[in-house]
A protein has these predicted regions:
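His/acidic metal-ligating clusters that form di-metal
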Residues: 1-66
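Binuclear metal-dependent phosphoesterase catalytic core
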Residues: 39, 61-124
Length: 124
């Protein structure tokens, strides 16, 4: 990684390096997660690994950092943990993640659903 080691870094991938628990999607995860994991562990400044591919939101600790998977902007995958369940779409809202660094170098992530929703309403 050519980035300076004294600043936090984000690594972006399409395929997650970790299992999601959804067998049909895990069959298509990153091919060499251990090789990437060794690089991630070598650097102490990897704040987050950001991915897509799962078509649903997921967060998991891995190799000293957090893997954050964004929802899809097209369709979401049905959450099925049983083996031999074929992948299926579900009509959950599409969405995206918005990541930003605050003034204290903390990475803050919001998940935003895309669609037409009532509101905003006063909140007390």
């Amino acid at each position: 990684l050519p980035a300076p080691r004294d600043r936090p870094v984000i690594v972006m991938l399409h395929h997650p390096p970790v299992k999601s628990g959804i067998p049909s999607m895990d069959a298509m995860r990153l091919r060499s997660p251990d090789a990437l994991g060794e690089v991630i562990e070598r650097y102490g400044n990897i704040e987050r690994v950001i991915c897509g591919h799962l078509h649903r939101t997921m967060h998991v600790r891995w190799r000293g950092t957090t893997v954050s998977v964004s929802p899809s902007t097209v369709d979401q995958i049905f959450l099925a943990f049983q083996r031999h369940t074929p992948p299926a779409a579900i009509a959950e809202p599409i969405g995206f993640q918005l990541h930003y660094w605050d003034d204290d170098d903390r990475l803050i992530t919001h998940v935003a659903a895309v669609g037409e929703f009532d509101g905003p309403f006063p909140y007390d």
